[in-house]
Amino acid sequence: MSPFAHLLALPVRAYRLVASPWVGHGCRFQPTCSAYALEALERHGAAKGGWLAARRVCRCHPWGGHGFDPVPGSEAPRQD
């Protein structure tokens, strides 16, 4: 992960450590939005990963989608 991606991951890690236990597990998606953000930053770097994480958080509301929503490019290889 790039240094800037590490910097962007700090608020996400702080949220998971401090706020998440108080808020509860109310994320509509799997993986959770914070796990998605960390994986997106790790896999795609600061710019694209930050953009993917921001888009995901904007979709996480009562009228948004739900269910399994993996980070693009993280699909498991198919076994034929």
Curated annotation (Swiss-Prot):
Coiled coil: none
Organism: Paracoccus denitrificans (strain Pd 1222)
Membrane topology summary: Peripheral membrane protein
Entry annotated with the keyword Cell inner membrane: yes
The keyword Hydrolase belongs to this UniProt entry's keyword annotation: no
Protein name: Putative membrane protein insertion efficiency factor
Record-stated family: Belongs to the UPF0161 family.
GO cellular component: plasma membrane
SMART domains: Haemolytic
InterPro entries: Membr_insert_effic_factor_YidD
